[in-house]
Amino acid sequence: MTTTYKILVLPGDHIGPEIMAEAIKVLTTIETHRPNLHFNLTTDLVGGTSIDTHGVPITQSVLDAAKASDAVLFGSIGGPEWAGVHPTPESGLLQLRQHLDAFANLRPCEFLVPSLVGASPIREHVVKGTRFIVVRENCGGAYFGEKKEEEDVASDLWVYTRPEIERLARVSAAVARIMGRSEDDNQAATVWSADKANVLASGRLWRRITSDIFAKEFPDITLQHQLADSMAMLMVRDPRRFNGVIHTDNTFGDILSDISGAITGTLGLMPSASLCGVPGEGHRSNGIYEPVHGSAPDISGKGLANPVAQILSVAMMLRYSMGLEKEATAVERAVVKVLDAKSEGGLEIRTGDLGGRATCSQVGDAVCEVLGPLLQGKKA
């Protein structure tokens, strides 16, 4: 029996189509070695290309197609040719998130490739072994609260409700369980909840409701509370301290996610996800999967783009929207084999941003070549 997954593919602008082509190669490779899986791909426009064709950064038909899909694979959007255009290309992504109610943003921070730890601006002995995921509430808080702005005074209402906090807590718990399974020990990862309960009423509500949910529904998962400002400091001094899942609101999640990106020092390797539901509950959970980096118009069309973040976004999609852990892990292991130094047993096939000379398509081809045997149960 074949299981079919509907995926909406939105390559976007500039390097978006280039890196997306390599991600689709990965899905095709999985289909070749997993005859019981089929990925039904529909490709459409978003961002600047949608503005050029339709006059808007995303059409209603694309929004409807996204809601009817099992997942959305998103490229990158924007560029200087759309400067001053309103609505902006980037607003297409915001509309997509709002339409799907993609309330949980996931940003991994880890050194998947051992020999690239040196890319971090922080000393290797401090960051080596770091592995956490920031789970950020994406649809509430100060960014979406009522705003007042006058000549000499302005305010942003920082509001959270019980349902908003509860649903994110359930996502954080699910991600902690999935992290534990991926480490082959079946022990859920620790969840670190970041707030400002010492000064913010919304922070006290956040801490109380998060504690209630974990005590009642996830008593086996370790929950720790940390003030967000001290977490930001400690994340730089000792990032391994927070290995596991960081569960936090929109504002603090925005800040902590950017710090996590600086820790790795390699935006070209960083995927992300915005989930519309709790993963791993025996049903499909829609989500938007995209690289963290931008559209890089300076290298567009030159074959220089690094496709790895887009490929790792595929791995996140397989894991969180489809529950295909073995396939997700195989994709990650293929990436490690391709990028890792020859001295570490890797192929050291890298694009220019990582000090190599390989083209975008050469990296994608190499990942697929390694992935095939891994899907058959062979070692890389």
From Swiss-Prot:
Reaction equations catalysed: (2R,3S)-3-isopropylmalate + NAD(+) = 4-methyl-2-oxopentanoate + CO2 + NADH
Top-level taxon: Eukaryota
EC number: 1.1.1.85
Name of the protein in its database record: 3-isopropylmalate dehydrogenase
Name of encoding gene: LEU2
EC top class named in words: oxidoreductase
Protein location: Cytoplasm
Chief localization: cytoplasm
Record: residues binding Mg(2+): D229, D254, D258
Keywords: Amino-acid biosynthesis, Branched-chain amino acid biosynthesis, Cytoplasm, Leucine biosynthesis, Magnesium, Manganese, Metal-binding, NAD, Oxidoreductase
